[in-house]
Structures are given as structure tokens and as C-alpha cells.
Amino acid sequence: MEVVAVDIGGTNARFAIAEVADGRVVSLGETSMQKTADHASLQTAWQAFAASLDRPMPRAAAIAVASPVGGELIKLTNNPWIIRPALIKERLEVDEYVLINDFGAVGHAAAQLPEDYFLHLCGPDTPFTKQGMLTVCGPGTGLGVAQILCTPDGYHVIETEGGHIDFAPLDAIEDNLLKRLRKTYNRVSTERIVAGPAIVAIYETLAEIEGRAVQRLDDKAIWLMALEGKDSLALAALDRFCLSLGAVAGDLALAQGAKGVIIAGGLGLRLKDHLARSGFSERFAAKGRFRTMMEAIPVKLITHPQPGLFGAAAAFAQEHAR
């Protein structure tokens, strides 16, 4: 059957028509992007997508949102839209739907995508286990964390708030970074260190350590300089970011008993060329007495361009295969 997959973030809402069968995604059509600022609600963005098609809309929806999905009213993060689940069928003119957290959708994508969509980062270059736990984590605007429990009968995605565990500094530079962040936040979570906006605090901490006066820049400007190799301090901040991502991914894998780790998130693909040559793998494995165990865990980067859309469709497929 066909389903309209929707991935709603703070800036954009992405739409695509997916075909699902037997609990899995068969295909995902071309992506259409609607800016959330151009629409008062999901309903009007949905109608704009429908108007762009030369065919009727499927009467099923798979919707991923940047917010917890429980309750009668869903307020999206960094987005003024409000979604009332009880009104979705009426407002969108669908017969059935699935509503899922956006990183839960990434978990479903990771569970269903072929191995071709994963880039090996460290650990053994082997396929993921078909039985046991996989950890999924991904830096974007925040730090998303999910688990995938693989069984002989399929899989189950467990949504978590693992991005909000406490940050643990591992060297003097990170001690300084933590001290800086504590001036603003009483409690410093890993999301303050391993998410897109965190690059600002890392950059400014390094500048302070080196005694350099730097212009106040936003995270987008620093990321651009770092990824284009235009500024040595921005590059150093990027290296530091990768170190922290490796440490956090390793902590999560250790805590969750993971047999594999998947890196995703809005920054994942942008870091593709940098992670492998940074200190990510060393920090991931550096867990004291458990180093040997950590070195045996395959760590891969998800490379699908639209894991949120694919995962929303996958969640619908799994739900309606029962």
C-alpha cells in the first residue's frame, strides 16, 4: 500500500510517498520540502504537497515530529505548529496514520535500511547483529538517542532521552568547557556538548585557552568554517566535537549493552569525511577495562539522505503488519 511519509522539523517539513508491504518499506518517492514558516499548520503544508502532485493523495500518513508524541496536544520543538492527534484523520483526510518521534523514526530507518546505506567508522567491518541491542545516536539541533532490539522475529525501537545524561569531561580542555557552560546552565548534559549549537561553546573555550580574541559567531558560521577548512580554530573545535561524540557514543553503547552503534542525525553526513580521521574511534573504545569489548563493536554512519522520511514509513509498515 502507499502512505504519505512526513518528517517535521523546526525549519522544514519533508513529504514523500512511500510504498510499504509485509512490514517493510518497498520504495520512497521524491522528497518535497515545505518551509514551516510558510504554513500556519501541518494541514496547510499537507495541502500544498497534495497540490503539487498530479495524482490523488494516499489515504494513509506516517508522521515523524521533533517532539514527544504522547498526549492530546503536541507542540513541536522550534516550530509553532500544534498537532492534535484526534483530528489528524479529519484534517488530513486519511483513514489511518502513525505518529512517531523523529528520532524514533531514525531508529526504524536504521533497522530496515540495507547495509549499503551504512559507512563503516570503527570496530569490525561486519554486518550488524540480527539478535541483540543496537544503539542509535545522532547530533543535530539536539542529541537524539534510540535503541533497536533485534530479535529472530523482527525488531523493536525504543525511544529514549539519552541526550540528556550528564556530560563527563575527560581532559583539561573539557574541564574548561564544562566550567564555561556551568555559568549558563546549572546542569550540563551531553546535548550541550554534542549537538550543532555546541560548537560555539567549544570554539570560544579553545579561543580563551589560547588567549585569542575572536568575533562572536553563531554555530552555522563556525560549522561552515570548520567543514570548509577555512579556520584553524574552527577545525580544532570540530576535532573536539568528534572526540566528545565518540566518548558519548561509547558510554551509551556500554550502558545499553549494544552489539552495534549507528551514528545518525542532521550532522552525521556532514561529518562523514572527518569522523574516520578524528579521535572519534579512540574515544569510543577508551573505556578502561572494557576497551577490548568496545573495540569489538561495529560502529557505522547512516548515509541515507532522508532517514526521517524512510523511518516514518518503516514505522507505519511495521505497525500495520501486525
Where are these predicted regions, by residue range?
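Short beta-strand-loop/turn "lid" adjacent to the catalytic site in phosphate-handling enzymes
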Residues: 53-99, 104-117, 268-273
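Short glycine-aspartate micro-motif
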Residues: 3-7, 58-64, 98, 134-138, ...
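ATP-dependent carbohydrate kinase catalytic cores
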Residues: 96-128, 220-232, 236-239
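Glycine-rich phosphate-binding loop of actin/hexokinase-like ATP-binding domains
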Residues: 121-124, 129-190, 272-273, 280-285, ...
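Active-site nucleophile and cofactor-binding loops and adjacent substrate-binding regions
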Residues: 34-36, 76-79, 98-105, 125-127, ...
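A glycine- and small-aliphatic-rich helix-loop capping segment at beta-alpha/alpha-beta transitions
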Residues: 20-24, 78-82, 113-121, 150-158, ...
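Short, acidic Gly/Pro/Ser/Thr-rich loop/turn segments
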Residues: 13, 68-70, 142-146, 201, ...
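ATP-binding/phosphotransfer module of carbohydrate and carboxylate kinases, centering on a glycine-rich
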Residues: 1-47, 51-54, 176-322
